[in-house]
Amino acid sequence: MVVIFDSVDAIGKDTQIEKLVQEAHKRGIITHILHYSNIKGLKDNNAVRDLSVKQYQSIFTFMKDVAIPSKDLFIYNRAHLSEYVYSPMYRNYDGYYVFALEKTILKDSLSKDIYLFSFIDNPEKIIERDKERGDGQSFSLDLDKKKQELDMFK
């Protein structure tokens, strides 16, 4: 089974994942957590996009060949929705390609055990939590950008 948690930073994905893992362990289910993030260290957005395409090809192939057929629980902390949302906003390229990859690679698997949770909350509360967390991981603490991010995750 595959469960994907995706949304903006500081919305509670990690908290929900921890709760799911605890429940799975109570039931004797083996869990694997895969955490994906943007590619760091490259200045050229075209190079980032090229590497991202390869990364998502690999993610979807692994999902199809290993995660979906397994009896284990594979939890993705971020996946392709983040690429779709953040690419045009912060990396200046269209992230819609992830849906074409998803459709091509997972075409026979999309009706299987794949569940997606995308969390939405009040943007002011998210920014407040993000500031309290203070890890500097969010792309932006700007209210208008946060609203745009949330709209794209819907």
Where are these regions (language model features)?
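Conserved P-loop NTPase "ATPase switch" module shared by AAA+ and STAND
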Residues: 71-84
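Loop/turn-to-beta-strand initiation segments
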Residues: 70-74, 112-115
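Walker A (P-loop) ATP-phosphate-binding motif of ABC ATPase nucleotide-binding domains
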Residues: 2
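Conserved protein kinase catalytic core
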Residues: 12-13, 83, 126
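Hydrophobic anchor at the beta1->P-loop junction of P-loop NTPases
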Residues: 5
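Conserved substrate/cofactor phosphate-moiety recognition/catalytic segment
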Residues: 11, 15-72
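Anionic group-transfer/hydrolysis microenvironments
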Residues: 8, 78-80, 120
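A glycine- and Lys/Arg-enriched "phosphate-lid" helix/loop adjacent to the NTP-binding pocket
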Residues: 86, 90-153
